[in-house]
């Protein structure tokens, strides 16, 4: 399941970051059209490194690593 910190591949063909991997910064739960904010290493033509995507436009590459507490 896609969650904060997950690595995702972009499927939106008209995106600057098409087929590149980014990290989920946040996921909005309010029901908006593009709830996932994805952060990238490189910037686009206007100098930004984040963009909003629909969950259907993303494929999870690797899950976020959870830290387990050892007793």
Swiss-Prot record:
Q: Which domain of life is it from?
A: Eukaryota
A GO BP entry: photosynthesis
UniProt xrefs under InterPro entries: Elect_transpt_acc-like_dom_sf (IPR008990), PSI_PsaE (IPR003375)
Q: Which Pfam families match?
A: PSI_PsaE
Mind naming one GO cellular-component term on file for this protein? chloroplast thylakoid membrane
Q: Which UniProt keywords apply?
A: Chloroplast, Membrane, Photosynthesis, Photosystem I, Plastid, Thylakoid
> Gene3D superfamilies this protein is in?
2.30.30.50
Give the membrane topology, semicolon-separated if more than one.
Peripheral membrane protein
Family annotation (PANTHER family): PHOTOSYSTEM I REACTION CENTER SUBUNIT IV A, CHLOROPLASTIC-RELATED, PHOTOSYSTEM I SUBUNIT IV
> What's this protein's family per the entry?
Belongs to the PsaE family.
The entry's function note states: Stabilizes the interaction between PsaC and the PSI core, assists the docking of the ferredoxin to PSI and interacts with ferredoxin-NADP oxidoreductase.
This chain's protein is named Photosystem I reaction center subunit IV
Q: Which organism is it from?
A: Trieres chinensis (Marine centric diatom)
